[in-house]
Amino acid sequence: MAEAATPGTTATTSGAGAAAATAAAASPTPIPTVTAPSLGAGGGGGGSDGSGGGWTKQVTCRYFMHGVCKEGDNCRYSHDLSDSPYSVVCKYFQRGYCIYGDRCRYEHSKPLKQEEATATELTTKSSLAASSSLSSIVGPLVEMNTGEAESRNSNFATVGAGSEDWVNAIEFVPGQPYCGRTAPSCTEAPLQGSVTKEESEKEQTAVETKKQLCPYAAVGECRYGENCVYLHGDSCDMCGLQVLHPMDAAQRSQHIKSCIEAHEKDMELSFAVQRSKDMVCGICMEVVYEKANPSERRFGILSNCNHTYCLKCIRKWRSAKQFESKIIKSCPECRITSNFVIPSEYWVEEKEEKQKLILKYKEAMSNKACRYFDEGRGSCPFGGNCFYKHAYPDGRREEPQRQKVGTSSRYRAQRRNHFWELIEERENSNPFDNDEEEVVTFELGEMLLMLLAAGGDDELTDSEDEWDLFHDELEDFYDLDL
């Protein structure tokens, strides 16, 4: 029954509030329904009311349950969680890793076994109902042996989570069919067989790895030492590295051969440097290897002479225009004519080495485009005897021009008659009226006539030195720069 209002006061309790108070007085257990607080009450209830708390002390404070009640001891609701059937259990504590410990605002208690059994029973019933409904819809697709299922369940109960032999569970191997612990027909023989196979493969791989030379020991030192999985080879007497395979004779002989070749090249280079470091240029009188500019530390090797010149000085000497061709093409010391100058980083004096250098120089020149041929747009006066490359823009090489049958002899006869005319003109003219060009023309014709006479009527001479000299004279006469 609702409590009467005291005299002099106004009853402010609404109808819903009176009904809730009546239900609270009639029932020994309070209903967890919180009425709307009055305007004067705070979020957690305000101060104590005039009736000393009343039924509100039997209701647990929802803010205190979450640890955020700011009223403290003045709260009109109960702060006793032991009597509350609606306590919030910490889900992290149930999982076993709550980081707050005793300071956690939620209850740290494990669920009762009766509750676990009830939850398990409900889960089982729901799963059975779902499976029965599914089987009724889909139909009898798979027949199951009830006795076998029960035996498996009993075996599962025997070797469940509480069993002590759970550490002996069968290991899952990728690529192999997995056999569960509950299957009595599953044996460990296939697993052991697979493991044995894997171990044999690993052993075979280890053996193959042991046959390979260690790349670190081959170039220096291996930090693993004797524990290295690779093979450390024998030391080579030439290079001092552990690169000789103990069981591969072919590899040992091949490496020793390559080491000897590399050693010979190094020795040749050392000898070349030794004989070149003190050579003095015959024009500037400086040691070639001691020039201030490193790009000028190169020799200009004359093809027919063994005198020493730096490349810069001999090229400058041979490019002079105020002297005759024989003077600038000859050696400044011995006056022997050399057809061309070969640039070289080392001094070369022996005939065989000089021939190798000349062949190497001509091979290098054959890879450079001839500026007179100009990719087919111009004409080179030396034709197929030119040192430089005659190639078209698409990469095709110039094919040597073939002369028709009988034209070669007729052409040589015409040239011979032409030079005889030059000689006759030379003899009949006044020698004091001849200028330098006519003298050069006469010398050039006389030299070519000698070449034709030496070769006979059928063939020309194949002397490269004579033809090179002829090229130089022709170059100077026609003001060419080849």
UniProtKB/Swiss-Prot annotation:
Gene Ontology cellular component terms for the protein in this record: cytosol
Annotated segments matching region Disordered: 26-52
ZnF C3H1-type: positions: 55-82, 84-111, 208-235, 364-393
Biased composition regions of type Gly residues, renumbered to the chain: 40-52
GO BP annotation list: protein polyubiquitination; protein ubiquitination
EC assignment: 2.3.2.27
Annotated SMART domains: RING, ZnF_C3H1
Induction conditions: Frequently induced in esophageal squamous cell carcinoma (SCC) tissues.
Major enzyme class: transferase
Post-translational modification as stated in the protein's UniProt record: Auto-ubiquitinated; which leads to proteasomal degradation.
Catalyzed reaction equations: S-ubiquitinyl-[E2 ubiquitin-conjugating enzyme]-L-cysteine + [acceptor protein]-L-lysine = [E2 ubiquitin-conjugating enzyme]-L-cysteine + N(6)-ubiquitinyl-[acceptor protein]-L-lysine
Low complexity: bias regions: 26-38
InterPro entries in alphabetical order: MKRN-like, MKRN1_C, Znf-CCCH_4, Znf_C3HC4_RING-type, Znf_CCCH, Znf_CCCH_sf, Znf_RING, Znf_RING/FYVE/PHD
Source species, domain of life: Eukaryota
The keyword Nucleus is assigned to this record: no
Known pathway: Protein modification; protein ubiquitination
CDD domains found in the cross-reference section: RING-HC_MKRN1_3 (cd16730)
Residues in RING-type zinc fingers: 281-335
Keywords annotated in UniProt: Metal-binding, Repeat, Transferase, Ubl conjugation, Ubl conjugation pathway, Zinc, Zinc-finger
Positions of region (Makorin-type Cys-His): 236-263
UniProt subunit comment: Interacts with p53/TP53 and CDKN1A. Interacts with TERT, modulating telomere length homeostasis.
Protein name: E3 ubiquitin-protein ligase makorin-1
Organism, as annotated: Homo sapiens (Human)
